């Protein structure tokens, strides 16, 4: 037959291409190339095979299920291609992305969440990417942001009164108002004399009620208002509130920054020769590491014997800053010892990649960072610390707890269980369409020197108490419930024993919150345990 082939095959549809259309009769391999279905309905193609010498051909049917219809306009296709490439390389559960159908035509935020949701649909393999309440994921830790100021970090500019947090509250049967929970130093609110525990009963002459607290709360956050302020004391063993008018206060509005350190002070323990350094630390930010070191210098100058680290409102930040703080606490005796070990996805681990951060060692996985080494000269060198925690305490904050415990430093926790973020993120920035896009996928587990990382359910406090129903007192004093317990622990060297009723809700100085003013606040830190983002060109 010479060059005459004895077998021919053809397809009835262009999407199903026969790549070995002709060949010799007998046993041979038939190769098909099938295109992805982009239509909403299933489809089929008939493959017909004719063999020389046989009167009738034979055929079979190739069926393909419903395809993916592009739902977007494709404006951000180049952004999405970059996001997908980085996620497939860096995401901690990157191998599961191969099983996700991706629509590159979507807006970048929908596309990003389609990846996360697609991985989650595979038996929640990325369960540790996010905060859960029961069986419900409340949010993902991984994030993608553009230039739009959706959330910010310590040091960024805001406009308003400078109140970090308010709470709409009822006191007993007689009083309703808005309680000041946290005031940012150096802001109009601080300059006007507002402090934690002030009780606002009217805004611009309008009394606070359960129907208007949202709008009045926003007005107080924004500033440029007149507020009626009261101080609160308690009688009858802390069961009866007494309001004392402080008068009307003109609350201004200005541009301000939210620093990482809201307060550092030294508290002398009564009937004791002990002194406690108190640090209200709101976010791990490398821009404030020099101030952090200076705060420890002030502690050293006053010969503090103990440290109360208040991380109730600290949801994390820079891994480098966490290592600086760990070094300032641990000191020279732990120099060179492992503070945190980063474990990456399977592909990177198989390639031998990992990352370490050590006490007092400036060489880190991500960069050479001098303040870590310099922190040794300013360290307290403690074997025991007291940490005030809440559900907001997360990531780089939990890294401090876990890292110090890995060194056998005693870390005593007071408050409520922490967030449980045992993972961190490597960031990357790239410009598209004259906008910057910042991508922070979860890309590593955080382990301590003992290899422990199993705290996705959070750290359980040694003294567990919900202070959200206890009227707030000034930070770093005996009037602050968690601060009081820490100071008592330091004074007696014994863990405080609480009445059973106080393990969940306060039994004295009781307040009843009736509305959420958390989401309305202008200062909303990003948090996380993050490595400094790398800019790609």
Model-identified regions with their sequence ranges:
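Short, small-residue-biased leader/transition segments that mark boundaries at the very start
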Residues: 1-5
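Surface-exposed loop/turn motifs at beta-strand-loop junctions within extracellular Ig-like
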Residues: 36, 51-53, 231-233
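C-terminal edge beta-strand
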Residues: 54-67
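C-terminal "post-core" interaction segments
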Residues: 276-279, 283-294, 298-306, 315-537
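A short beta-strand micro-motif common to beta-rich folds, especially ectodomain repeats
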Residues: 41-52
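Flexible, low-complexity junctional segments that flank or bridge functional domains
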Residues: 68-307, 321, 331, 505-537
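Low-complexity "stalk/linker" and mucin-like segments enriched in Ser/Thr/Pro/Ala/Gly
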Residues: 10-28
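Short, surface-exposed loop/turn segments at beta-strand-coil junctions that are enriched for proline
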Residues: 35-41
């Amino acid at each position: 037959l010479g060059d005459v082939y004895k077998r021919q095959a053809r397809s009835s549809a262009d999407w199903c291409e026969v790549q070995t259309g002709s060949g010799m009769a007998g046993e041979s391999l038939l190769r098909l190339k099938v295109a992805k279905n982009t239509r909403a309905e299933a489809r089929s193609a008939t493959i017909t095979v004719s063999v020389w010498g046989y009167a009738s051909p034979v055929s079979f049917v190739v069926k393909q299920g419903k395809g993916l219809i592009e739902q977007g306009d494709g404006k951000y296709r180049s952004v999405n291609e970059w996001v997908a490439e980085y996620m497939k390389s860096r995401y901690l559960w990157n191998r599961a992305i191969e099983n996700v159908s991706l629509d590159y035509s979507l807006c970048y935020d929908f596309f990003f969440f389609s990846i996360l949701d697609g991985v989650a649909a595979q038996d929640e393999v990325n369960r540790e990417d996010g905060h859960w309440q029961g069986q419900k994921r409340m949010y993902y830790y991984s994030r993608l942001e553009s230039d739009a100021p959706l959330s910010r970090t310590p040091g960024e500019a805001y406009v308003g009164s400078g109140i970090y947090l308010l709470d709409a509250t009822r006191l007993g049967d007689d009083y309703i108002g808005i309680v000041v929970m946290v005031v940012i130093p150096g802001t109009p609110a601080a300059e006007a004399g507002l402090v934690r525990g002030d009780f606002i009963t009217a805004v611009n002459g309008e009394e606070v009620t359960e129907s208007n607290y949202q709008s009045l709360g926003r007005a107080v956050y924004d500033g440029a208002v007149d507020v009626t302020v009261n101080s609160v004391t308690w009688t009858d063993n802390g069961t009866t509130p007494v309001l004392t008018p402080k008068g009307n206060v003109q609350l201004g509005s200005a541009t301000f920054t939210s620093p990482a350190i809201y307060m550092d002070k030294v508290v002398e323990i009564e009937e004791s020769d002990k002194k406690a350094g108190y640090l209200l630390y709101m976010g791990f930010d490398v821009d404030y590491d020099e101030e952090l070191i200076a705060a420890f210098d002030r502690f050293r100058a006053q010969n503090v014997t103990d440290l109360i680290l208040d991380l109730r409102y600290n949801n994390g930040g820079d891994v480098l800053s966490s290592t600086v703080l760990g070094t300032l606490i641990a000191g020279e005796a732990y120099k060179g010892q492992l503070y945190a070990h980063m474990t990456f996805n399977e592909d990177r681990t198989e390639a031998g990649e990992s990352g370490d951060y050590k006490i007092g060692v400036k060489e880190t996985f991500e960069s050479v960072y001098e303040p870590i080494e310099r922190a040794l000269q300013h360290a307290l060198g403690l074997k025991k610390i007291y940490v005030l925690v809440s559900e907001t305490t997360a990531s780089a904050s939990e890294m401090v707890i876990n890292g110090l415990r890995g060194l056998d430093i005693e870390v005593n926790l007071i408050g409520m269980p922490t967030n449980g973020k045992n993972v961190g993120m490597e960031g990357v920035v790239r410009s598209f369409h004259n906008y910057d896009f910042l991508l922070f996928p979860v890309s590593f587990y955080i382990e301590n020197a003992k290899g422990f990382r199993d705290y996705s359910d959070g750290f359980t406090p040694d003294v567990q108490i919900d202070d959200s129903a206890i009227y707030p007192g000034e930070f770093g004093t005996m009037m602050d419930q968690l601060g009081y317990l820490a100071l008592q622990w330091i004074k007696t060297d014994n863990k405080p024993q609480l009445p059973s009723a106080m393990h969940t809700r306060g039994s004295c100085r009781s307040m009843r919150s009736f509305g959420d003013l958390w989401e309305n606040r202008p200062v909303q830190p990003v948090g996380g345990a993050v490595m400094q983002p790398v800019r790609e060109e």
